[in-house]
Regions:
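Well-ordered alpha-helical scaffold segments within catalytic/enzyme domains
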Residues: 35-48, 89-105, 146-160, 200-211, ...
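Low-complexity, Ser/Thr/Pro/Gly-enriched N-terminal "stalk/linker" regions
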Residues: 1-23
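Extended, well-ordered alpha-helical scaffold segments
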Residues: 48-65, 104-127, 160-180, 213-226, ...
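Conserved catalytic-core motifs characterized by acidic clusters
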Residues: 6-8, 12-14, 171-192, 231-240
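Extended ligand-binding groove/face enriched in aromatic
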Residues: 20, 24, 32, 41-154
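Loop-centered beta-sheet repeat module
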Residues: 120-201
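Terminal, non-catalytic domain-edge segments
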Residues: 101-104, 208-228, 233-314
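Solvent-exposed loop and edge beta-strand segments that line ligand/cofactor-binding
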Residues: 15-32, 72-89, 130-144, 183-198, ...
Length: 314
């Protein structure tokens, strides 16, 4: 399915004209992801980032004028489903990163981006009740992953007296996933996955459920974790041709799995019998794909750093 569908005669604007804040990468959501990576590294490891160049670049992108153009794009009725929900969720992730960063530039950029984040929050709130079924896949449409990526900002907004997004996420999460049992994770992965549908759902529910209820839910959902079962879920994915954009997704699957394994272990009580298997799997998956974050083909490099950065923690 094309990213843009012609509804009239050309000429058509360039990607940079449509998206002056998020352009220059393979697609819009990858631009958002990689700008988030730079912001995250500036916040966590400022001494290891080319500081002046990073700030200058972000400062030229994240301006009120550029964000107004982005808003105009998403306000166009023809674009109402573009980047839904994956790109929306990554934009909310970027906004959250800016807001928790104690930095003068970060505060200015957060103020600039917030109107776009507010629009996509409102769009997500309006869309979730219409979603009859969740999408359980290992790619961009995965519902659980996008809810998870949106959750940090939703919780922050709720703490500021704006609970609507958090309420929408919780309602959707419980409606779609709370009753799930014996998930067939033995059929993962598919040949173009960069997410685990099973682990994305489990990680989301680790955030939504009461900590006392989550261990039992997880046992019913994925009953073999203590024994590293199903084996296909605990075995790092084997990629192949990194110049093929679909096959290249499998390199990222290992990192997204590693992150989920760690988060699940953190959500379980001390001494839980599943924790050693989860942490061992996280380590093995990360070792396979971390070397590909830099120095590889563009079809991997243009997005993989985002999934490596998720491993850094909250």
């Amino acid at each position: 399915m094309p990213l843009f569908i012609a509804t009239g005669p050309g000429p058509y604007p360039s990607h940079r004209e449509l998206h002056p804040a998020f352009y220059g990468c393979f697609d819009w959501h990858s631009c958002v992801e990689m700008e988030w990576v730079v912001i995250r590294l500036l916040r966590l490891f400022p001494g290891d980032v080319p500081l002046d160049r990073a700030r200058e670049t972000l400062g030229g992108l994240l301006t009120p004028r550029n964000i107004a153009t982005e808003i105009a794009f998403f306000n166009n009725p023809n674009h109402r489903s573009v980047e839904r929900p994956y790109g929306w969720a990554w934009l909310l992730t970027l906004q959250h990163e800016l807001e928790i960063w104690n930095d003068e530039d970060g505060a200015r950029w957060a103020a600039a981006v917030r109107p776009l984040a507010d629009l996509l929050c409102a769009n997500l709130i309006a869309w979730l009740p219409k979603l009859t079924y969740p999408q359980r896949m290992g790619m961009h449409g995965n519902t659980a992953f996008s809810l998870l990526r949106s959750l940090d900002l939703a919780e922050r907004r709720a703490g500021e007296g704006e609970p609507d997004l958090l309420s929408a996420i919780r309602t959707a999460g419980f409606r779609f996933f709370a009753q799930d049992t014996e998930y067939p994770a033995q059929y993962e992965p598919s040949g173009a996955d960069f997410l685990s549908a099973a682990l994305s759902e489990a990680e989301l529910m680790s955030r939504l459920l009461d900590p006392a209820r989550f261990p039992a839910w997880l046992d019913a959902f994925l009953p073999g974790l203590a024994e590293s079962q199903p084996a296909s879920l605990f075995t790092p994915a084997i990629g192949g041709d990194e110049t093929d954009g679909q096959i290249a997704h499998l390199t990222g699957l290992n990192l997204s799995r590693a992150t989920s394994f760690v988060r699940l272990a953190e959500a379980l009580p001390a001494g839980d019998v599943r924790t050693p298997a989860l942490l061992d799997a996280a380590s093995r998956h990360a070792r396979v794909s971390l070397p590909a974050v830099t120095g590889g083909d563009y079809m991997v490099e243009h997005w993989l750093a985002a999934y490596a950065s998720l491993l850094l923690g909250p």
